[in-house]
Amino acid sequence: MPLHNLTRFPRLEFIGAPTPLEYLPRFSDYLGREIFIKRDDVTPMAMGGNKLRKLEFLAADALREGADTLITAGVIQSNHVRQTAAVAAKLGLHCVALLENPIGTTAENYLTNGNRLLLDLFNTQIEMCEALTDPNAQLEELATRVEAQGFRPYVIPVGGSNALGALGYVESALEIAQQCEGAVNISSVVVASGSAGTHAGLAVGLEHLMPESELIGVTVSRSVADQLPKVVNLQQAIAKELELTASAEIILWDDYFAPGYGVPNDEGMEAVKLLARLEGILLDPVYTGKAMAGLIGCISQKRFKDEGPILFIHTGGAPALFAYHPHV
């Protein structure tokens, strides 16, 4: 068993049963290709999403260290911050969130609805900043201030994307491999690539469990040149933690994130509407809409390695639909 070292790491079980892996019949007919979807949008806390897999490991480490406060950072409409706040509430911990407004909007829905509304429901302490120019340093500075107030803080990086958090997506690769075994031979796997933890964790896990499947990250915030070192560095850090080798090529497509992170584009919004109308499944304008636009566009461009079945990793994010109204 190549991933046996996973069991060495403390983990809180928030998710329970595996999330569904489903065939999309109407969407497949529309695209002329077999499309499957991994439904991490329906993880069972705070309207779902992929970050809960990372938080199973990160929150366990926080409790091990005796923390009483979780500190993290992100944009106003961060799915990660929303799920971190929910985990803190469930565990009886304080949560402090350092937020930025990366698109400089004054739109009321973006500033108060969607994920931001949920942060208030989870009783999150909000600290605003002009920009997360050096989030690791900014989080450490915030942790120092919180500690001076008598709390015992545990810092969770942006997106939960360090080697420990990314183990959640090595675990996910195990789940995917078990669900596919004897049912479908997945040719390609598509995932949104942002803070890089989900992408890197899948890269390590799938290399050992489904080596014939190519993994493609569709960038949501950076060019290939900027994103590649982030994914590779995390891939190698995860492999080191698990005492494995990681030599799988990291494939990135950066044609679909313009005009920038957190700004919807036409292709992404069309993908959101298409999957909603054909399958009743909700994507979001920031991550999964753009990643699905990459899947759709690259079928017609024949950029996949062959014409076999494609698995789309649905990382969640639907609460942001309300924040981006009326653009949706």
From Swiss-Prot:
Ubl conjugation among keywords: no
Keywords for the protein's UniProt record, in alphabetical order: Lyase, Pyridoxal phosphate
Modified residues (N6-(pyridoxal phosphate)lysine): 51
Gene Ontology molecular functions: D-cysteine desulfhydrase activity
GO biological process: D-amino acid metabolic process
Record EC number: 4.4.1.15
InterPro entries (UniProt xref): ACCD_DCysDesulf, D-Cys_desShydrase, D_Cys_desulphydr_bac, TrpB-like_PALP, TrpB-like_PALP_sf
Pfam families: PALP
Catalysed conversion reaction: D-cysteine + H2O = hydrogen sulfide + pyruvate + NH4(+) + H(+)
Cofactor(s) named in the record: pyridoxal 5'-phosphate
Record HAMAP family: D_Cys_desulfhydr
Quaternary structure and partners: Homodimer.
Family: Belongs to the ACC deaminase/D-cysteine desulfhydrase family.
The protein's role, per its UniProt record: Catalyzes the alpha,beta-elimination reaction of D-cysteine and of several D-cysteine derivatives. It could be a defense mechanism against D-cysteine.
This protein's name: D-cysteine desulfhydrase
Source species of the chain: Shigella sonnei (strain Ss046)
Gene name per UniProt: dcyD
